Amino acid sequence: MPPKQAQSKKTVEKEKKKKVEDKTFGLKNKNKSKKVAAYVSQVEAQVKHSGLQNKEAALKEKAKRDKELAEKAKKEAESILVNTIVQSKVPLGVDPKSIVCEYFKQGVTCPKGNRCKFAHDLAAGRKSEKIDIYTDRRKDEDTMENWDEAKLKSVVEKKRTTENKAKPTAIICKFFLDAIESKKYGWFWECPNGGEKCAYQHCLPEGYQLKKKKSREEDEVEEIPIEELIEEERAKLTKSTPVTLETFLRWKEEKRLQKEKAAKDAQDKRLADIKAGKTSMSGREMFVFNPDLFVDDESAIDTKSKEYEKSEEEIAALANQINTSLFTDGGVLPSDDDDDDDDDDDDDEDGDDEEEDDDEEEGEYEEEEASDE
């Protein structure tokens, strides 16, 4: 089927003009009212640019479809590739996060996502790898294979100018040693003495021992067990006597005599110091050296003898006397008999008062009768 011929410009303009007339049909005062004129111009602009808008919309739709198709193709490729990827096994004692996930390494979405036990970071293997402090990394990195033409020319020129100069020094860089001792040396460490241009060595010679490691080894000196120490001392003996009951008893007696002699010498020295006034004598020493000072004479009293024992009644009376002295300022409290005597005296005084009253009444009565007569 032959392709359709494109419309001419005149036909397109006629169609646009017709669309504008159809949309503005029936409007009054097209040439007088500003609002109507603005609406007409807006419709004309829409009709004029409708072709461009349709073209842009078509391009956007096409790009969207292409993107969806690409994603679909990628998912299909991933689904095929997932079945072929085999996850590496974790060796015993190795952290899984130090191993890069095979799916992530191949650029495929990991089916486990965040729950994956392997690392989703391409630098994980490099981070876990221990750096070698006995080799200078600058020598390995700066090889002739990595040189370009400018680098090659600079090396040749440098060799010409430095042929008669001294060879590179074998002295170890002090900044490198400090970084090793303080545990700051790593893949991203840079030497403060010029970085890669530092003239000193950035590696340790074979057999070099760090100060921290040396001090740690000195602190961790292995203690020899007592059994091994005894065996070593026994092996050093040149002549030895077999241990029997007789030799053991003789050795024990000698030790006892030596101990007694040492105690006697110490006692004599102590006594000599006391006599010389260099030190004072304790109570126990006074009793040991001169027991006569502690013998009782005739005036001594034995408080535990029966002569000084008191009965319970005497003790109670003594206690009562102490209690009464607390309230009477040393006086004696009145007894019950004293209370009875006081009561009798009061009764006698009352009786005397009553008799006096009776006598007075009788006298008054006699005086009244005498006056009546």
From Swiss-Prot:
Chain segments annotated as coiled-coil in the UniProt record: 252-326
Name this polypeptide is given: Zinc finger CCCH domain-containing protein 15 homolog
Keyword Kinase: no
Species annotation: Dictyostelium discoideum
Keyword line: Coiled coil, Metal-binding, Repeat, Zinc, Zinc-finger
Source superkingdom: Eukaryota
Cellular component terms per the entry's GO annotation: cytosol
Gene Ontology molecular function terms on file: zinc ion binding
Any one GO biological process: cytoplasmic translation
